[in-house]
Amino acid sequence: MSSAAADHWAWLLVLSFVFGCNVLRVLLPSFSSFMSRVLQKDAEQESQMRAEIQDMKQELSTVNMMDEFARYARLERKINKMTDKLKTHVKARTAQLAKIKWVISVAFYVLQAALMISLIWKYYSVPVAVVPSKWITPLDRLVAFPTRVAGGVGITCWILVCNKVVAIVLHPFS
């Protein structure tokens, strides 16, 4: 495929990249949750701790506070200690989960920005599409920016239009 033919299909290339990035952005929360579940296996330990706390509370309900105060107090302290340990464990896991989601989001947006910058760089002086100039007469210079081709649609305008159209199309799915 020659360079001229590649430039002829630039509008489709940009549209597909924008569509792909927006679909990935919609799927990003699900992907982040999946990755955090894969990277964190602490939920089993937490459920075991919860089960132990439940067992101790059940045992505590069978102990008479008046007759066996020492045993009751010991068991109550043990429950409180285990509950505090569980709370700190959950806080640490939640913080790690937020960090994982943040890193995945930042990585995605950096890659998306790099992709858009590379598209702008490649098609900076070439119009992505050429339409009759009377179709865009009042805004022809703005739409053609940065190419300065009469009737041309510049890469920046095309990316904005593609983003808006794809966002409208994907809105029901997000």
From Swiss-Prot:
Residue ranges, Cytoplasmic side: 30-99, 170-174
Subcellular compartments: Endoplasmic reticulum membrane
Chain segments annotated as transmembrane: 9-29, 100-120, 149-169
InterPro entries registered for this protein in UniProt: Get1, Helix_hairpin_bin_sf
Coiled-coil segments on the chain, per record: 39-94
Lumenal-facing ranges: 1-8, 121-148
Region (Interaction with GET3/TRC40): 39-97
UniProt-recorded Gene Ontology molecular function terms: protein-membrane adaptor activity
One record GO biological process: protein stabilization
The UniProt record lists the keyword Transmembrane: yes
Family recorded in the similarity comment: Belongs to the WRB/GET1 family.
Quaternary data: Component of the Golgi to ER traffic (GET) complex, which is composed of GET1/WRB, CAMLG/GET2 and GET3. Within the complex, GET1 and CAMLG form a heterotetramer which is stabilized by phosphatidylinositol binding and which binds to the GET3 homodimer. Interacts with CAMLG (via C-terminus). GET3 shows a higher affinity for CAMLG than for GET1.
Protein name: Guided entry of tail-anchored proteins factor 1
Gene: GET1
